[in-house]
């Protein structure tokens, strides 16, 4: 990831198992996927509010299999009959980028190096990655190059 003024402005993520390369960011306002030999531009977020997304019945939410704690379960339980998409690592961001989920709640520890590149790709598509304070989503974006590289909890949408 390329970070400027504490914000991820460009990222590149390759997933060898899936042979997918994602790249893009806010500098260009777009993101791309190379899947094997095929290259396609990823679609921009519809920029729906988190409140509106949570209210939609059957909204796809991507969550970790191994880090699904009580806070994550409580968030999911507050949604309207969501469809859970399980995925590991920072690939959860990329599930949003591909349009296969609309919310990624993260209520477990991550480090900046775990999230920055995929976060940049998402932000290039107009998605939000807001921190959670006191168990509640804020309108504050996740920052990088902090003194403590541990990320706060966040929700991407």
Regions found by a protein language model. Give the residues of each.
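Oxyanion/phosphate-interacting regions
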Residues: 73-78, 92-157
């Amino acid at each position: 990831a390329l970070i400027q003024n504490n914000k991820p402005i460009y990222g590149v993520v390759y997933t060898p198992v899936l042979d997918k390369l994602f790249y893009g960011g806010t500098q260009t306002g777009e993101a791309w996927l190379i899947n094997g030999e095929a290259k396609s531009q990823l679609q921009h977020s519809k920029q729906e509010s988190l409140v509106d997304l949570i209210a939609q019945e059957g909204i796809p939410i991507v969550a970790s299999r191994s880090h699904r704690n009580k806070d994550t379960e409580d968030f999911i339980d507050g949604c309207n009959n969501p469809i859970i998409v399980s995925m590991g690592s920072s690939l959860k961001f990329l599930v949003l980028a591909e349009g296969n989920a609309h919310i990624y709640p993260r209520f477990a520890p991550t480090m900046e190096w775990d999230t920055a590149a995929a976060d940049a790709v998402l932000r290039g598509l107009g998605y939000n990655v807001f921190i959670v304070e006191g168990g509640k989503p804020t309108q504050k974006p996740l920052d990088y190059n902090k003194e403590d590289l541990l990320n706060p909890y966040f929700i991407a949408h």
